[in-house]
C-alpha cells in the first residue's frame, strides 16, 4: 500500500509530502489520518525538528477534498477531524512552510493558509 503522506527528515527539517499525485493530492479521510499522525509526531519532537515543509508530490500541491472518497462513503474519524488537523498544523511549535506548486483548491488552500509561510510557484 502506498503511503499517502511521506515524511523525510534532514538537518532538522521535516518534509511532509502529500503523496497522491495521480489524484492531484486530493484530500481523502485516509490521507488526513496519516497527516495527523505525522503532525503529532513532529509536535513532540522539538529537539530534532526545527522546521516543517509541507508539499505535494507531482505537479500539484493539492486539488482539495477528494469527492470520490466522499461518494464512496469514506468518513473521517470525527466530523471535525480535518479542521482539527489543520488547527494542529497551525499550532505546531516549529515554523511550517507550505511549498505550493500547481493546483491549490478548497481543503488544499486551507492547508497552505494554516502554515506560517507560503511559497508558491
Predicted regions and their residues:
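Hydrophobic alpha-helical membrane-association signature
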Residues: 31-35, 81, 111
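Hydrophobic/aromatic residues within transmembrane alpha-helices
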Residues: 16, 54, 66, 111-113
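Glycine-rich beta-to-alpha active-site loop
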Residues: 88-121
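Histidine-centered beta-alpha loop that forms part of the nucleotide-sugar donor binding/catalytic region
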Residues: 19, 65, 101
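Phosphate-coordinating loops and pocket residues in cytosolic domains that bind phosphorylated ligands
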Residues: 26-29, 63, 72, 114
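Glycine- (often His-adjacent) and acidic-residue-rich active-site loop
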Residues: 48, 56-88, 104
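Conserved CoA-thioester-binding segment of acyl-CoA-metabolizing enzymes
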Residues: 1-57
Amino acid at each position: 500500500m502506498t503511503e499517502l503522506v511521506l515524511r523525510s527528515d534532514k538537518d532538522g527539517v521535516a518534509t511532509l509530502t502529500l503523496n497522491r499525485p495521480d489524484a492531484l493530492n486530493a484530500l481523502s479521510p485516509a490521507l488526513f489520518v496519516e497527516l495527523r499522525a505525522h503532525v503529532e509526531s513532529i509536535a513532540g519532537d522539538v529537539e530534532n525538528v526545527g522546521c516543517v515543509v509541507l508539499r505535494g508530490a507531482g505537479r500539484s500541491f493539492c486539488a482539495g477534498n477528494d469527492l470520490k472518497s466522499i461518494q464512496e462513503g469514506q468518513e473521517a474519524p470525527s466530523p471535525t477531524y480535518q479542521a482539527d488537523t489543520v488547527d494542529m498544523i497551525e499550532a505546531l511549535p516549529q515554523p511550517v512552510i507550505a511549498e505550493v506548486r500547481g493546483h491549490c483548491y478548497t481543503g488544499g488552500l486551507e492547508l497552505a493558509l494554516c502554515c506560517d509561510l507560503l511559497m508558491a510557484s
